[in-house]
Amino acid sequence: MVGRDRWAGRIRPPGGSSLPLLFFEMNEVRIPAGRATLDGNLTIVDGATAIVFFVHGSGSSRHSPRNQFVARTLNKAGLATLLFDLFTPEEESIDAHTAELRFNIMLLAQRLVHATNWAKQQEQTRNLRIGYFGSSTGGAAALVAAAEIPQDVGAVVSRGGRPDLAGEALPKVQAPTLLIVGGNDDIVIELNEQARDRMRCEVKLEIVPGATHLFEEAGALERVAQLASDWFVTHIGR
């Protein structure tokens, strides 16, 4: 594992002060992905049996405050997390001017597959069960990757995602999938309903009342984080 910086500390799990603090270690890592090298933040929680890969949406990165919030919730539930950039800095610069990469779902999915294969070779993560958490276009990429390597992926969660962009991969997904959409995100609700109806695996559509696409309303992101945590713990967690 290539690490540039490392932090360690303790976090309190759900349930209050009566439970022991969980030890965690976070490393900045570099992930080979074909000709590209991707930067990521890997957090390992003591005793974790599963890891969740975060697949950000268009115009975002591993520094997404929403994904970081959800990741901390998963860490408190005893899950390891990997937040990583889908593009190199050079690619981000190109995409900022052309927008030609952010909707290339196959490229995003392949980057996720590369990251998964990398994690399977690292001592800290090779024995952990795997889940994907995708946002916006990242939701589609997560489903395409899950369909490509079904033996490796145990659960998928999509937040405000565009699963419709996964196209022909949808009926091939085997991992239990949770689709989370804001109640006021009408168009995306319809797209998620259509995608759900094409899937053959265990799939659930969860609507967060009063929430818009980015879940910026009070309590909305907390609800997303708890739904995701429950789904991953049930399907790949302890």
PLM segments and residue spans:
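Catalytic histidine neighborhood in serine/cysteine hydrolases
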Residues: 199-214
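Short beta-strand immediately N-terminal to the catalytic nucleophile in serine-hydrolase-like folds
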Residues: 131-134, 159
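Gly/Ala-rich beta-loop-alpha elbow adjacent to hydrolase catalytic centers
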Residues: 134-142
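Conserved alpha/beta-hydrolase "acid-adjacent" motif
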Residues: 186-191
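Short beta-strand/loop motif that positions the catalytic acidic residue
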Residues: 173, 179-181
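Serine-hydrolase catalytic machinery in alpha/beta-hydrolase-like enzymes
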Residues: 29-128, 216-219, 223
